[in-house]
């Protein structure tokens, strides 16, 4: 999704994850109409989201953050070995090499490393769709590149990735298809190879671009 700031693109995320109600239209997933009554139902389908605030706990380590709310237990006791093994397997599968130890406290991580942990948590549960809400906001150049490389690896691993961003450079670096929103409504969805940055700007600011056939 590409949009101007403040056009309620995060609200679209809320609808996609059923955190917000759907008042009209249909929810189609894998070609079928589905009725979802909340975020847990969306999660059960394999839809995961990384919100802009990341929802990480600074006082917990990487492993406990990745399993927060969905801890593995054995005889009502946390199964630390299983969680650590799964966390390491997930990070290795994404070729994450930027954290020294998965037992590091999140408070010691950089912005890019925090984003990496949040994204890794989203793919830990056999997810099919990962929604990233402005994952590079407030990151430096090197950290942004780190996160975008991770987004590419998600796609290479067969996951559908919905990237919500106001940064055209980021969008054009990783996207296959671009959906432009104007005043909270879909202006157009076009293959990246068939549209230029200036045309995207026209779509998100005016809702139309004659050069791509949207009037």
Regions of interest found by a model, annotated:
Residues 165-166:
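H-loop/switch region of ABC-family ATPase nucleotide-binding domains
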Residues 171-173:
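A short, surface-exposed alpha-helical micro-motif characterized by mixed small hydrophobic
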Residues 25-36, 41-45:
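Conserved ABC transporter NBD signature motif
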Residues 145-157:
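Helical segment within the ABC ATPase nucleotide-binding domain
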Residues 177, 189:
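Short, glycine/charged-rich "phosphate-handling" switch motifs in NTP-dependent
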Residues 1-18:
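Single conserved hydrophobic/aromatic residue that forms the stacking wall/gate
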Residues 130-134:
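Catalytic Walker B motif of ABC-type/P-loop ATPase nucleotide-binding domains
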